[in-house]
């Protein structure tokens, strides 16, 4: 029997009532589970350009242990990452590489600007300078800003918590007392 002789059954789909295509499956609960899984298993890509990269390395050590909060392995490849941590001064010569790496990351992707240099150019941002990008947000969309020169490892962890909050819509870890006072009472 040839392939053209086989009867093809039309798909059995019930027409939607009211002229609106009703969803077949409610994926909202599944999406919530996926968001929690995504938030608790972020794979950061380090883009350490200056002093702040040292603090980023400290977060991976035993005292702070970023793996407790779901960001265990710093990935060397943008195709394996969903969080880019830009730490340090971004020069105009480095800007195209940063944008290219961001574009190679799979969606959804998140960016954290770590330190004053990544946020605004830091002490290198002065009148007449030509080599420094005045904030990484001029190149790629930034989700969380972590200020400091350099920021403490605890601040980087708080930035990670903010990204997790952005993904899931809820706070998973308590706000430390020294941070909650500066945030206006806690989350």
Swiss-Prot record:
[4Fe-4S] cluster binds at residues 51-52, 117, 149. The keyword Translocase applies. One of its GO terms (cellular component) is respiratory chain complex I. Its EC number is 7.1.1.-. Binds 1 [4Fe-4S] cluster. Keywords: 4Fe-4S, Cell inner membrane, Cell membrane, Iron, Iron-sulfur, Membrane, Metal-binding, NAD, Quinone, Translocase, Transport, Ubiquinone. Its cofactor is [4Fe-4S] cluster. It is an enzyme of class 7 (translocase). The keyword Ubl conjugation does not apply. GO terms for biological process: aerobic respiration; electron transport coupled proton transport. One of its GO terms (molecular function) is iron ion binding. Its main location: membrane. InterPro entries: NADH_UbQ_OxRdtase-like_20kDa (IPR006137), NADH_UQ_OxRdtase_20Kd_su (IPR006138). SUPFAM superfamilies: HydA/Nqo6-like (SSF56770). It catalyses: a quinone + NADH + 5 H(+)(in) = a quinol + NAD(+) + 4 H(+)(out). It is found in: Cell inner membrane. It holds the Pfam family Oxidored_q6. It is a peripheral membrane protein. It comes from the Bacteria. NDH-1 is composed of 14 different subunits. Subunits NuoB, C, D, E, F, and G constitute the peripheral sector of the complex. Belongs to the complex I 20 kDa subunit family. NDH-1 shuttles electrons from NADH, via FMN and iron-sulfur (Fe-S) centers, to quinones in the respiratory chain. The immediate electron acceptor for the enzyme in this species is believed to be ubiquinone. Couples the redox reaction to proton translocation (for every two electrons transferred, four hydrogen ions are translocated across the cytoplasmic membrane), and thus conserves the redox energy in a proton gradient. This is NADH-quinone oxidoreductase subunit B. The lineage of its organism: Bacteria, Pseudomonadati, Thermodesulfobacteriota, Desulfovibrionia, Desulfovibrionales. The gene is nuoB.
